């Protein structure tokens, strides 16, 4: 994958565990969505799963190259704290990925986990786990305030890029 010697990918989820249950028993049975600290993962019927199924059917990836892990709230919180102790400030979603990776790694293996959100988006979680004032909101984001959904550019944001519509 991407020219890297990747043995497997881990589909890490929070308590909304439809994919891991399906991977284990072959039954696609979405349950009611459970609110969690990693709220962007609060999806009980992920609409991107058919893409994975298609890649499997085409032989692009093999079943043995995909693992699944469910990370509960306590483990997510532990991940935030552990990563902080390692000098990395993580938000809950990356902490889910980190804890899943820690469980899956075999002796002698190395791994990579990915996260895309900034910890400042989760002030309640960060303060509860690491204390007040740990996460600094970048000045440019604090000054900008919330974005609208109409594609307007921020005032003063003249960097030559076009606004994106959502």
Predicted feature locations:
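PLP-dependent amino-acid enzyme catalytic core
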Residues: 1-166
């Amino acid at each position: 994958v991407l020219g890297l010697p990747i043995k497997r990918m881990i589909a890490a989820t929070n308590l909304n565990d439809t994919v891991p249950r399906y991977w284990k028993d072959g039954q696609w049975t979405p349950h009611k969505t459970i609110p969690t600290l990693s709220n962007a993962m609060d999806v009980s019927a992920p609409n991107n799963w058919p893409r994975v199924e298609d890649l499997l059917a085409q032989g692009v990836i093999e079943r043995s190259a995909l693992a699944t892990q469910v990370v509960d709230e306590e483990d997510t919180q532990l991940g935030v704290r552990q990563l902080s102790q390692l000098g990395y400030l993580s938000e809950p979603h990356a902490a889910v990925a980190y804890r899943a990776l820690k469980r899956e790694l075999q002796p002698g293996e190395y791994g990579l986990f990915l996260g895309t959100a900034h910890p400042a988006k989760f002030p309640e979680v960060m303060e509860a786990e690491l204390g007040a004032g740990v996460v600094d909101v970048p000045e440019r984001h604090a000054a900008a305030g919330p974005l609208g959904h109409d594609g307007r550019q921020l005032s003063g944001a003249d960097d030559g890029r076009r606004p994106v519509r959502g």
